[in-house]
């Protein structure tokens, strides 16, 4: 009996030793993978802060904000005089740019009603180097009239108070327009000669899709045989408060989601309708409501292999040790990472194609059962997926022949005035010379940030240049530094920009032009 007990004890001891060895090996594997995460941040010296006449620069932005360049989907509603006034403001505010850069207008693009602008800064060398395109837009979204009393300063005041410049467009996107023009003006005055052609595009209808602005400019560029190494538009930025990261994150968009508006319609026979006092088991509204609920309860699958994975490859090495263990072992902890991201609206949008019902229409009387009901579904589609794959997912989820899906109809069954969808963009390189130039510039001007690529969830005018025959790489980044409160000001009440941030934006564009087009 003692022998048996002794043998059993030895076996138990050996078993636990094996368990401990296995745990040690597993821990070593996790730690090894975490240790393999090497920083991808470029080590550069911060630039010497150049002298900028802040009073003049801020007055230019204030004047720009005071011009209410609101764009509408139906461009007949646009006030052409304010767009012309804005163009004249640029011409008088930046005399060196006006004198030395060639300016193209709507007439050059074949549409005299197009108030978008394109500046060409010709290279000082004869060698063929692909050009770069720097983009911003000067149209803004309308002000909700019921919100006017909530504004601390009138939305088109351009007021400067307590370190902020207030007004619609300060963040989206007149701040970038004026910062870009200030940078060009300073460089022209200093005698800077670019070694490659530089184009500056200032759109007038980005907020409504860019159909008459940058879409026409991009077509004109193709017709002229212009080739772009890089296009840079809005989309990313510098954000504070990224979970697990002690420093701000400078997120550069290397792709953007597509979108589609889908009309989901239920059409019943007249025999299935009638008086509300004798309702059938199912109604058009009930069927539609059930389908909407089913879609919301069955979200598109998450994809960690997309923009989130690339972002973590850059940010992971800058995080704490335990975060590095999770990120360095994504094949093991992928589901945990996905759950953490999808717990917030922004993180959820980064991980998957999203769907949200935005409009619903049915009924014609309080006591009558309608034969039809329709809802608009707005989808933002992940790069790597398509509009067609999204439609297949919806059909497989609903599985109801009484429900039809249309991308070419509005809720009332009429044809859409404009294209109801845009496919996701290509994924641009995060190892190209142009991305490296962006990365380097960000670190020179904002030395305490961690740079990372990501996928933009919104749509930008850069989509019109997302054509490999025209543009090699498309990036999306605006050099503002925002926390979550600042992000909510975009298109919101009390939109404003810190005056110090605006001055840093000028320095960023100036240094970017030097890095990408300076003589080396």
Which residues does each predicted region cover?
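Loop/turn elements at helix/coil->beta-strand transitions in domains of secreted/extracellular proteins
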Residues: 99, 128-131, 194-198, 226-229, ...
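Metal-dependent amide/peptide-bond hydrolase catalytic core
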Residues: 13-20, 25-54, 59, 237-248, ...
């Amino acid at each position: 009996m003692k022998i048996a007990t002794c043998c059993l004890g030895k076996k138990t001891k050996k078993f636990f030793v094996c368990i401990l060895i296995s745990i040690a090996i597993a821990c070593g594997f996790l730690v090894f993978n975490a240790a393999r995460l090497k920083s991808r941040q470029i080590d550069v010296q911060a630039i010497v802060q150049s002298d900028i006449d802040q009073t003049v620069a801020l007055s230019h932005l204030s004047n720009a904000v005071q011009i209410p360049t609101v764009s509408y989907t139906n461009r007949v509603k646009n006030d052409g005089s304010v767009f012309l006034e804005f163009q004249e403001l640029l011409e008088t505010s930046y005399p060196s740019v006006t004198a030395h850069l060639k300016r193209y207008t709507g007439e050059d693009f074949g549409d005299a009603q197009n108030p978008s602008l394109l500046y060409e800064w010709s290279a000082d060398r004869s060698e063929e180097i692909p050009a770069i395109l720097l983009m911003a837009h000067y149209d803004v979204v309308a002000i909700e009239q019921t919100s006017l009393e909530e504004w601390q300063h009138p939305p088109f005041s351009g007021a400067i108070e307590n370190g902020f410049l207030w007004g619609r467009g300060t963040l989206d996107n007149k701040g970038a327009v004026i910062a870009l023009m200030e940078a060009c003006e300073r460089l022209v005055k200093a005698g800077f000669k670019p070694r490659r052609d530089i184009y500056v595009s200032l759109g007038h209808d980005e907020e409504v899709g860019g159909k008459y602005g940058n879409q026409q400019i991009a077509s004109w560029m193709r017709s002229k045989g212009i080739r772009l190494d890089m296009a840079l538009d809005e989309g990313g930025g510098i954000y504070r408060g990224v979970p697990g990261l002690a420093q701000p994150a400078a997120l550069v968009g290397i792709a953007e989601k597509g979108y589609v508006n889908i009309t989901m319609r239920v059409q019943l026979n007249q025999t299935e309708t009638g008086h509300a006092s004798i309702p059938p088991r199912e109604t058009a509204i009930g069927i539609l409501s059930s389908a909407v609920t089913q879609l919301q309860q069955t979200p598109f699958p998450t994809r960690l292999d997309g923009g989130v994975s690339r972002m973590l490859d850059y940010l992971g090495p800058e995080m704490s040790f335990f975060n590095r263990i999770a990120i360095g072992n994504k094949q093991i902890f992928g589901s945990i990472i996905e759950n953490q991201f999808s717990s917030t609206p922004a993180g959820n949008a980064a991980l998957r194609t999203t769907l949200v019902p935005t409009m619903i229409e049915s009924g014609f009387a309080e006591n009558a059962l309608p034969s039809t009901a329709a809802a608009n579904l707005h989808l933002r589609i992940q790069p790597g997926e398509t509009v067609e794959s999204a439609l297949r997912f919806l059909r497989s989820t609903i599985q109801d022949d009484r429900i039809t899906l249309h991308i070419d109809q509005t809720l009332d069954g009429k044809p859409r005035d404009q294209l109801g969808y845009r496919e996701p963009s290509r994924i641009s390189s995060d190892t190209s010379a142009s991305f490296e130039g962006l990365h380097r510039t960000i670190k020179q001007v904002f030395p305490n940030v961690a740079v990372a690529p990501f996928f933009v969830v919104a749509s930008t005018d850069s989509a019109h240049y997302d054509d490999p025959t025209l543009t090699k790489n498309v990036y999306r980044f605006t050099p503002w530094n925002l926390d979550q409160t600042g992000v909510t000001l975009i298109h919101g009440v009390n939109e404003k920009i810190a005056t110090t941030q605006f001055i840093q934006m000028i320095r960023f564009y100036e240094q970017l032009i030097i890095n990408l087009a300076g003589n080396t």
